[in-house]
UniProtKB/Swiss-Prot annotation:
A Pfam family per the record: FtsJ
EC main group: transferase
Chief location category: cytoplasm
GO MF annotations, alphabetized: rRNA (uridine-2'-O-)-methyltransferase activity
Reactions the enzyme catalyzes: uridine(2552) in 23S rRNA + S-adenosyl-L-methionine = 2'-O-methyluridine(2552) in 23S rRNA + S-adenosyl-L-homocysteine + H(+)
GO cellular component: cytoplasm
InterPro entries: RNA_methyltr_RlmE (IPR050082), RNA_MeTrfase_FtsJ_dom (IPR002877), rRNA-MeTfrase_E (IPR015507), SAM-dependent_MTases_sf (IPR029063)
Species for this entry: Stutzerimonas stutzeri (strain A1501) (Pseudomonas stutzeri)
Taxonomy, superkingdom: Bacteria
Stated name of the protein: Ribosomal RNA large subunit methyltransferase E
Length: 206
């Protein structure tokens, strides 16, 4: 089957991507790990002993970074509809976190605790239809904000990937209504032509 120009371009970029090569060398699960590493260096998000939740975690790039920082006295609770291999200091729930049974499983694992930080690098399966992809992306990030409002510790922090486009400004306002401070970051590991940015929201109002 002949590949489309866009898929060929992605493959060429991926093969030659310095962050892909670096991830392989450093033993990290994905190039996206470096996005969280950079965000953490700038915004001091993760500390040893913390409880972190990772929404849309597979293949585990962010959970791997967070688990390494929180250490044995901390914990990362990760969830995704896709399977994810085991990682140190990480508990994983497979399923759709908006479904009652999966949400209850997450609550059971929290056991009354509230996360200090919720992170999400979640993205929909891309269809190639820009308007549909943007709508799907905004729907997913709104679901992560719903989870934040249900379980995040007051004063806690939230990091989420957003694709700039229809609905993103309204989502930013919505996040700002629930947090003391929100900044927009574009990590070095984000591909230059990507519309993705990361909202770093601090001081959940509860």
């Amino acid at each position: 089957m002949k590949r489309s120009k866009s898929s060929r371009r992605w493959l060429d970029e991926h093969v030659n991507d310095p962050f892909v090569k670096r991830a392989q060398k450093d033993g990290l699960r994905s190039r996206s790990s470096y996005k969280l590493i950079e965000l953490n260096e700038k915004d001091k998000l993760i500390r040893p002993g913390m409880l972190v939740m990772d929404l849309g975690s597979a293949p585990g790039g962010w959970s791997q970074v967070a688990g390494g920082i929180v250490g044995e006295k901390g914990r990362v609770l990760a969830t995704d509809i896709l399977p994810m291999g085991g990682l140190d200091n990480v508990d994983f729930v497979q399923g759709d976190f908006t479904e009652d049974a999966v949400f209850q499983q997450i609550l059971d694992m929290l056991d009354g605790r509230q996360p200090d930080l919720i992170v999400s690098d979640i993205a929909p399966n891309i269809s190639g239809v820009a308007a549909a992809d943007q709508a799907a992306s905004m729907y997913l990030v709104e679901l992560t904000l719903d989870m934040v409002r249900q379980v995040l510790k007051p004063g806690g922090n939230y990091v989420v990937k957003v694709f700039q486009g229809e609905g993103s400004d309204e989502f930013l306002k919505d996040v700002r209504s629930s947090f003391e401070k929100v900044v927009i970051r574009k990590p070095e590991a984000s591909r230059p032509r990507s519309r993705e940015v990361y909202l770093v929201a601090k001081g959940f109002k509860g």
